[in-house]
A protein has these predicted regions:
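Conserved PLP-enzyme active-site core in the AAT-like
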Residues: 47
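Active-site-proximal beta-alpha core segment in soluble small-molecule metabolic enzymes
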Residues: 10-13, 18, 24, 28-32, ...
């Protein structure tokens, strides 16, 4: 066997601008075809009952594809609701002109956040009696009723009302 040196050092000084020559899109890129989103939603929607709601989840800026753009095509395809992860995402989408119901999938724990949610015509996800009581107090204070989504923990033990106690808590 030959005796080789294993720790050779490459002289990068000979190539001072080699990083600038690398195209970041060289190996990975994405092209969003709105018509494909619309067609996919329409196909999925066709498999559902006419009375069934269809929510397009567009969190993380439409999974990096522009939430407004993805939302527009999903709505054209028949999405009746949209879902986002955070209050800020919901506000941004609503202020972009989207009129459909928008559900905030993440929890809103404070009265302030819930008021902001309702003022922006967004629907919060509620997963505790405490949050229900806050919503009830806000509704009484403003003399209004607000739509909301109740999250029930059906086994993942993450968020939501405990399944076994859910009915008891609302009697």
């Amino acid at each position: 066997m030959q005796n080789r040196q294993t720790n050779q050092v490459f002289n990068f000084d000979k190539f001072p601008n080699f990083e600038k020559d690398i195209d970041p899109k060289q190996r990975a890129w994405i092209e969003v075809k709105g018509k494909a989103i619309e067609t996919n939603v329409r196909q999925l929607r066709s498999k559902l009952s006419k009375n069934c709601q269809f929510m397009a989840v567009v969190k993380a800026d439409g999974y990096g594809h522009d939430a407004k753009l993805v939302s527009e095509y999903a709505i054209k395809g028949g999405a009746s609701q949209l879902g986002v992860a955070t209050l800020n995402e919901g506000i941004k989408l609503r202020s972009s002109g989207v009129k459909k119901p928008i559900l905030i999938l993440g929890n809103l724990y404070t009265k302030r956040d819930l008021i902001i949610c309702f003022k922006n015509d967004l629907m919060p996800t509620i997963s505790s009696i405490r949050e229900c009581l806050i919503c009830n107090n806000i509704g009484k204070h403003f003399g209004l009723k607000f739509p909301l989504h109740l999250k029930v923990d059906t086994g993942m033990s993450r968020l939501g009302f405990e399944y076994n106690k859910f009915v008891q808590q609302f009697e």
